[in-house]
Amino acid sequence: MVQATLRLESQWPASPAFGWALAPLEVSVLLSDDEAVQALNAQYRGKDKPTNILSFAMEEEADDAMPMPIMAGEPRLLGDLILAYQTVQREAAEQDKPFDQHLTHLLVHGTLHLLGYDHERSEDEAQQQEAREIAILAQLGLPNPYL
């Protein structure tokens, strides 16, 4: 397992893709294996299978909450992202995408969950989250992952 705490201060917070000013953000990232992620997925989501990424926010959002802007100021710990290495690697190969691009997409996807987005809440929110992902990845010079 590989664990790191990332501080997102460079291109991402200044990106117009967000639509608001962000304080420096900290995210703990754990690159784990399918077995460990499957156990966490079963425990916290009731799904006994591995998934590519799990997001655990430091602050819980209400079920119907929309993402709220984080205003500039002190660094804020958003939460934890846990990725299943084998699943991410397999998906990248199946989708004929470079591993690093797929991994970056999942990190953006998971971070948006930490910011309050939830594509499972409604179709409208799924479209909003997908549009944000595409815009952020474009700012990083990466292609639309949904094509």
UniProtKB/Swiss-Prot annotation:
SUPFAM superfamilies: Metalloproteases ('zincins'), catalytic domain (SSF55486). Keywords: Cytoplasm, Endonuclease, Hydrolase, Metal-binding, Nuclease, Ribosome biogenesis, rRNA processing, Zinc. Binds 1 zinc ion. GO terms for biological process: rRNA processing. Its cofactor is Zn(2+). Its EC number is 3.1.-.-. It is found in: Cytoplasm. It is an enzyme of class 3 (hydrolase). PANTHER family: ENDORIBONUCLEASE YBEY, CHLOROPLASTIC. HAMAP family: Endoribonucl_YbeY. This is Endoribonuclease YbeY. It comes from Magnetococcus marinus (strain ATCC BAA-1437 / JCM 17883 / MC-1).
